[in-house]
């Protein structure tokens, strides 16, 4: 029962659920009915629900039928009216179709026109859009075209600026266009191209200034020369408030605008063409010859590109290489002045360019870099000049070189480079210049001395007399009073040598100009060089003349006279140096001239040569002596050779009238002593083993002839018998043997007042031995044999006593 109740309860619940589902189906949209139906299929009462659903459908059909039946008449009427309307509608449709056909026919052209208008409007919109886009693109294209034009005309820095504007201002506005992407891709390439082209221009510039450095330097040195000439003119004229040209005035200010489109700023040649200037026009500035725009452009371009340091390093490296090339002198530079000039021009040109770069760029080169280059250049230049100047043997070339070095130093000093070392080196070259002058003047003196006739200068008129006196400081009142023609005591080489000494002093003075030396230094330099000229060059030249083999006594006498007058002229040379240097001789540390010593030495050498020459002549005459030492005949006159010798000596000493008295007296005494010594040697020589009393008698006649010559006073100034003393040894020896006064000799030997004081026992013994041998072999007088034996015994006795004197003397 309970089970029945439970089934009934379940049936009621199912029925209620089905009712709910049906209401949902009726009230729910068809699209959302799926979940409701799923709940039916999920349950177990599917059949009942279908039955319930059929029941509900039948109920609704009945209600619909009832409703239709209630409204049927109205429906029929409506259908009737609808049928009527359909006919009218058909008519209306036909009319509309006909109207449409007519309208289509009539509006076909309009439609075509409208279609054309539509296309036109579309084109207008497209054109307008295109114009707008082109207005955005046109500046880009214009800038790109401008960039290309600038690249084509080599305006690289403006091109780089244009490229910057193009990249950062214009291209971002139209970056979605394909051509812009192409441009963007080309920008790095263009930058590299600009960079490469500007570097190429820089290389061309560097190569150009390397080739034209000598022209730049030549112009700069001409400017410096003009300025120096102008300063010299100003210094010679009264001036008020004048100022020396400053370093700033040496520069030509370059107003080079890098972005300028002027032809000059866009030229890539480092050197501008300069027309030949007229002589009276100003020499163009060194920088006027150079267009530095390639350097400025390249510097700015690399700065903009962030590679300034790379550019600076490259520029300095290349210029260092060029400096080494410039500083390498040609091997034949020393041969001509043009070689030195070209070398200096290149160095000056190099540093003029670098100095201008230093003052017109910000940091491309700095003072430390310039100083480093200059130190290197200075050391190499000085080394090259020392080497090549040492080859110079022409003093004129050395002097021209000195002037060129001074101009070189002055030019670089204007640009602020220290040049003290160059002037120090010039002091070294000064010594070399002095040596070349000494060599040149050695040739001049040699020519003068070789061409001189060594005869007093004859003058036949007042003009000739004044001409000689004007060339050489000579005063002689007695000579002035003499009538013409008359003669100066000296020969022509005296005024010539004196004037050449003055010319040498002038040549030394020329070198000291522009060396910034004080008057005392110049005076000291001239005096030292002149002393070298006198003590070495002129002295050697005089000594060479004096020592010549073919020099005659007349020439030697004239040389002594000439050197005497040159010695007197030394004070005038002192005055001459004082006048040109304005340094008084009394100044402390002033070097004195050694001319007096030089001429004294030369005169003494000439005197010695006279003595030697005289002795040689005497020896030549003595070689003609032909004594018969075994003769028994007694002669009555002197030997012929001796007579000729005495005649030669008389004529020779007659020439000595112009010599100083002591010189003539010394020469005469020397000749007599040498003659006496030679005669003594002739008498005692070993080859003469035997001699007779007759030979001694002849020898005695020759000695008497010599004594007669000495007594005649061939040279004035000797006291009585002074000259005869030269023959006193011979006289006493001959008297001893001829008078055979051995008892007196042996008795008085060693006493101060001995009659034969000058006879040496050795000499007497030697001569006695020669006579003893003769006595032994002489058999001519047999009837006097006892007398001969007595004489022989006497000779032996005397010889024995002489040996005793000799041995006692030695002991």
UniProtKB/Swiss-Prot annotation:
Q: Name one Pfam family in it.
A: Sec15_C
| Cited InterPro entries | EXOC6/Sec15, EXOC6/Sec15_C, EXOC6/Sec15_C_dom1, EXOC6_Sec15_N, EXOC6PINT-1/Sec15/Tip20_C_dom2
Taxonomically, which superkingdom? Answer: Eukaryota
Coiled coil region boundaries: 50-119
Region (Disordered): which ranges?
A: 260-280
UniProt keywords, alphabetically: Coiled coil, Disease variant, Dwarfism, Exocytosis, Protein transport, Transport
- GO CC: one term? exocyst
Q: Might you name a Gene Ontology BP term for this protein?
A: mitotic cytokinesis
Sum up the protein's function in the record's words.
Component of the exocyst complex involved in the docking of exocytic vesicles with fusion sites on the plasma membrane.
Q: Which disease is it linked to?
A: Spondyloepimetaphyseal dysplasia with joint laxity, 3: An autosomal recessive bone disease characterized by multiple joint dislocations at birth, severe joint laxity, scoliosis, gracile metacarpals and metatarsals, delayed bone age and poorly ossified carpal and tarsal bones.
What PANTHER family would the database entry show? Answer: EXOCYST COMPLEX COMPONENT 6B, SEC15
Subunit field text = The exocyst complex is composed of SEC3, SEC5, SEC6, SEC8, SEC10, SEC15, EXO70 and EXO84.
The Swiss-Prot or TrEMBL record describes its family as follows: Belongs to the SEC15 family.
Descriptive protein name: Exocyst complex component 6B
């Amino acid at each position: 029962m309970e089970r029945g109740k439970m089934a009934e309860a379940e049936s009621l619940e199912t029925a209620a659920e089905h009712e709910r589902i049906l209401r949902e189906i009726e009230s729910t949209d068809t699209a959302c009915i799926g979940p409701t139906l799923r709940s039916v299929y999920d349950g177990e009462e599917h059949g009942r629900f279908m039955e319930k659903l059929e029941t509900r459908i039948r109920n609704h059909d009945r209600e619909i039928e009832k409703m239709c039946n209630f409204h049927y008449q109205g429906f029929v009427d409506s259908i009737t009216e609808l049928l009527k309307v359909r006919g009218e509608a058909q008519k209306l449709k036909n009319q509309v179709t006909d109207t449409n056909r007519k309208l289509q026919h009539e509006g076909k052209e309009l439609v075509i026109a409208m279609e054309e208008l539509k296309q036109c409007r579309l084109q207008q919109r497209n054109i307008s859009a295109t114009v707008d886009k082109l207005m955005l693109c046109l500046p880009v294209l214009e800038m790109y075209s401008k960039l290309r034009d600038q690249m084509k005309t080599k305006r690289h820095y403006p091109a780089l600026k244009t490229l910057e504007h193009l990249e950062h201002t214009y291209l971002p506005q139209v970056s979605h266009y394909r051509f812009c992407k192409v441009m963007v891709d080309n920008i790095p390439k263009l930058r590299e191209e600009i960079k490469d082209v500007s570097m190429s221009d820089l290389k061309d510039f560097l190569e150009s200034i390397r080739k034209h450095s000598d022209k730049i330097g030549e112009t700069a040195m001409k400017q410096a020369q003009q300025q120096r000439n102008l300063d010299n003119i100003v210094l010679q004229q009264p001036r008020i408030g004048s100022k020396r040209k400053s370093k700033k005035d040496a520069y030509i200010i370059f107003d080079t605008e890098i972005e300028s489109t002027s032809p000059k700023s866009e030229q890539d040649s480092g050197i501008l063409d300069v027309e030949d200037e007229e002589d009276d026009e100003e020499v163009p500035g060194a920088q006027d010859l150079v267009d530095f725009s390639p350097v400025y452009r390249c510097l700015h371009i690399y700065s903009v590109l962030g590679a300034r340091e790379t550019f600076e390093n490259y520029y300095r490296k290349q210029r260092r290489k060029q400096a080494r090339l410039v500083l390498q002198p040609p091997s034949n530079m020393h041969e001509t002045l043009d070689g030195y000039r070209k070398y200096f021009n290149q160095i000056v040109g190099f540093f003029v360019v670098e100095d201008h770069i230093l003052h017109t760029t910000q940091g491309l080169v700095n003072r430390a870099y310039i100083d480093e280059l200059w130190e290197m250049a200075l050391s190499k230049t000085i080394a090259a000049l020392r080497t090549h100047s040492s080859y110079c043997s022409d003093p004129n070339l050395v002097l021209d070189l000195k002037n060129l070095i001074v101009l070189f130093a002055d030019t670089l000093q204007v640009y602020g480079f220290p040049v003290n070392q160059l002037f120090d080196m010039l002091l070294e070259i000064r010594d070399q210049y002095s040596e070349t002058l000494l060599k040149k003047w050695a040739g001049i003196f040699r020519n003068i001395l070789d061409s001189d006739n060594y005869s007093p200068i004859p003058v036949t008129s007042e003009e000739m007399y004044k001409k000689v006196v004007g060339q050489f400081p000579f005063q002689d009142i007695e000579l002035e009073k003499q009538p013409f023609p008359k003669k100066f005591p000296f020969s022509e080489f005296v005024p010539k040598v004196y004037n050449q000494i003055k010319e040498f002093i002038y040549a030394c003075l020329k070198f000291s100009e522009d060396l910034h030396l004080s008057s005392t230094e110049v005076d000291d330099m001239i005096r030292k060089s002149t002393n070298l000229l006198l003590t070495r060059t002129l002295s050697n030249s005089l000594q060479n003349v004096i020592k010549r083999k073919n020099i005659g006594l007349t020439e030697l006498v004239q040389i002594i006279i000439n050197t005497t007058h040159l010695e007197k002229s030394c004070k005038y040379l002192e005055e001459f140096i004082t006048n040109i240097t304005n340094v008084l001789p009394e100044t402390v540390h002033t070097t004195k001239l050694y001319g007096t010593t030089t001429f004294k030495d030369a005169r003494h050498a000439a005197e010695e040569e006279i003595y030697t020459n005289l002795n040689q002549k005497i020896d030549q005459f003595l070689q003609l002596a032909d004594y018969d030492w075994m003769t028994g005949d007694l002669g009555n006159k002197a030997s012929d050779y001796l007579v000729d010798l005495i005649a030669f000596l008389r004529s020779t000493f007659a020439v000595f009238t112009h010599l100083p008295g002591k010189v003539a007296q010394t020469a005469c005494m020397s000749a007599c002593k040498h003659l006496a010594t030679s005669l003594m040697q002739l008498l005692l020589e070993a080859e003469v083993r035997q001699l007779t009393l007759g030979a001694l008698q002849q020898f005695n006649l020759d000695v008497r002839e010599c004594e007669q010559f000495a007594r005649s006073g061939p040279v004035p100034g000797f006291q009585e018998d002074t000259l005869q003393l030269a023959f006193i040894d011979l006289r006493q020896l001959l008297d001893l043997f001829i008078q055979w006064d051995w008892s007196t000799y042996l008795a008085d030997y060693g006493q101060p007042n001995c009659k034969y004081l000058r006879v040496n026992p050795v000499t007497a013994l030697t001569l006695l031995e020669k006579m003893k041998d003769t006595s032994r072999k002489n058999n001519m007088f047999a009837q006097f044999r006892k007398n001969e034996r007595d004489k022989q015994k006497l000779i032996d006795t005397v010889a024995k006593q002489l040996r005793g004197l000799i041995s006692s003397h030695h002991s």
